[in-house]
Amino acid sequence: MSICAIWGAPQTGKTTLAVNLAYAVSRGDQSVCLISPVAYSELSAILGVKIPEENSLSAALRGAPLQRTVFKVDELFYVLAAPSAASAPDCDYSGEQVKTLLELARMTFDVVLVDCLSETNDLFSAWALNRADKVLLCAGGHVSGVLWHRANKKALQAAQDKTLYVGSEIIPGLDYAAMYELLKCTPEIKIPYIREAPLFQNERRFLFGLSGKKGRAYAGAINKLCEVITT
């Protein structure tokens, strides 16, 4: 029904956000398909699953039936990503193939999330940003993200009418307020820092649903994003 692109500078926690947001949407009794054109199947590593060629983004782009190519992670949670065994990114597809796949996914699932590459020259990510109803732009991360924002000023301006800034505060002690001032943005929703995040990911545990004060704060931020993309 709707397409949401998740974008931002490298190392801003885009994929972690995408995985946990998709999981949260599925917990709300809505079907969600998380699509990632990222090479070497980063998603399969985070989720702890092996994505075969026949259940991959490559197969879907070549015209294989979508219902047979998506990989089921959990009830109502599906993934369409690069195959785990891929040794190099598959770039042998056209813009029309991407548009067709995105529209088919829109008609098939309640929510489609696309974990976009930071690079603006990636064809799949470019079309996902173009066709998206909403763009979640991860701001924060590392200081180097300021340079990325400056280098991609035109692309950011093109999507500004449908962009919601998400504060990705992944480094403890960093003055993110000063960074947001440099970026001239005010994140509407901030994702709190969770020190144990790498450990939980290694254990194949979602950050959404963690107990404790930080877990509740994280869930609160994710739930707000769910409202944004599902209403």
Give short role names for the model-derived ranges:
Residues 29, 74, 109, 132-133, ...:
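Short, well-ordered alpha-helix to beta-strand connector turns
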Residues 6-7, 35, 81-82, 113-115, ...:
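Conserved beta-strand segments of the P-loop GTPase G domain that flank and frequently precede/overlap
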Residues 122-142:
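Inter-motif core of Ras-like GTPase G domains
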Residues 2-39:
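Walker A/P-loop phosphate-binding motif and the immediately C-terminal alpha-helix
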Residues 108-119:
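Glycine-rich phosphate-binding loop used to anchor ATP phosphates in small-molecule kinases
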Residues 33-107, 199-202:
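P-loop/Walker-type NTP enzyme "switch/lid" segment
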